[in-house]
Amino acid sequence: AVLVKTFVEAGADVSWSGCNPLSTQDDVAAALAADGVSIFAWHGMNVEEFYWCIEESLRFKPNLTLDDGADLIFTIHNKHQELVPNVIGGTEETTTGVHRLRSMAEAGALKYPVIAVNDAETKWDFDNVYGTGQSTLDGILRATSVLIAGKNVVVAGFGHCGRGVALRAKGLGANVIVTEISPTTALKATLEGFRVMTMNEAATVGDIFVTATGVKDIIVERHFKSMKDGAIVCNTGHYDCEVNIHDLEKLKKSVREVRANNEEYLLKNGRRIYLLAKGRLV
């Protein structure tokens, strides 16, 4: 909202849509709309509604695109290349989006310049570590009201975001376990005092699981089957592909919402798994 207001005060016309189906705060969106900003988003959109909002925002024929996850840029390139000549350039805020756009650029498919905001030191070394670390734990606490101290918290990935989550969990008294595929990064986690193991091993002992990799299928069927009763599972990567929800659905006997952004999956084996924010950005 602050960024949107800054652009408006600088003389720009702004069209805004959400970067994630669950990330929009309706009161903030309503306040901006009341000030005359074109808003296409609401909390709890499904996938079809999410992309409909992007399509509506593109009717604006933008000169600049500001993205978080690259869905806006992807939609322009895949469905509305007629808009490309009008676009001076864009920005991409998050790690996952930058990875997607770098792949496009390497393939020669990126049609206009994009600034990788995530590569800025103030983003990479500060927001990713300390901002994501704190906001992830805040999201878990709001959705569960669980005591972190003494819990086995499994963090998948020890990049900047994963490291931030691990540090904040450790600061709250958790026993932190890190899973990491890079030997060098795994060694860094070890030297910072964290236990390192595979997800197959961690699945049997974890109380709270947080994925922070940007890679799909980090937690899958075999891991759900191994988890203890009452395990909490969430994701702090941008997309909902890290925790395989399809696999969890196959194992369920029933599902119910126990708190806002907290669903209890009763499995056929009698154990319960609590999925936060539908596996999206917690």
What positions do the PLM features span?
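Flexible loop/turn segments at secondary-structure boundaries
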Residues: I73-F74, T122-W124, G162-R163, T185-A186, ...
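Adenosine-phosphate binding glycine-rich loop
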Residues: D13-S15, H43, Y112-G150, I245-V282
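N-terminal ligand-binding/catalytic initiation module
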Residues: A1-E121, R256, A260, L267-G270, ...
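Glycine-rich phosphate/diphosphate-binding loop of Rossmann-like nucleotide-binding domains
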Residues: A1-V4, V8-G11, D127, G131-V205, ...
